[in-house]
């Protein structure tokens, strides 16, 4: 994936047909480890294709991947209902207002 990204960055940078060496330069500039064999395979696979074609093919492939399962079915209600626990209302002490403490933000 990083080789594909580097290839696309080189293409966006103005290089219409990046070589494996160009891909490696982009990756090294980002501080990433590089493998010439992987760079060559990506360049060979993308040779003669435009960015638009690569993105369109990627969209087609991503649309065929399932993106999640169906929602789980709701559980059937049990025979007896448990009594609801009474909610206790806590009275929270009112906090003192910090509106005027004798000084302003822009004084």
Swiss-Prot record:
Annotated family: Belongs to the eukaryotic ribosomal protein P1/P2 family.
Gene field: rplp-2.1
Description of how the protein assembles with itself and partners: P1 and P2 exist as dimers at the large ribosomal subunit.
PTM annotation: Phosphorylated.
Positions of region (Disordered): 63-107
Biased composition (Basic and acidic residues): 84-93
MF terms (GO), sorted A to Z: structural constituent of ribosome
Gene3D superfamilies per UniProt: 1.10.10.1410
Its biological purpose: Plays an important role in the elongation step of protein synthesis.
Protein's name according to its UniProt entry: Large ribosomal subunit protein P2
Signal peptide bounds: none
GO cellular component, one term: cytosolic large ribosomal subunit
């Amino acid at each position: 994936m990083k080789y594909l990204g580097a290839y696309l960055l080189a293409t966006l940078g103005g290089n219409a047909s990046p070589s494996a060496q160009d891909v490696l330069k982009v990756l090294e500039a980002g501080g990433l480890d590089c493998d010439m064999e992987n760079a060559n395979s990506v360049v060979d696979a993308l040779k003669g294709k435009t960015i638009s074609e690569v993105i369109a093919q990627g969209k087609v492939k991503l649309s065929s991947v399932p993106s999640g399962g169906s929602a789980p079915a709701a559980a059937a209600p049990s025979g007896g209902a448990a009594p609801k626990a009474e909610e206790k209302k806590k009275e929270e002490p009112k906090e003192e207002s910090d509106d005027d403490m004798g000084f302003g933000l822009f004084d």
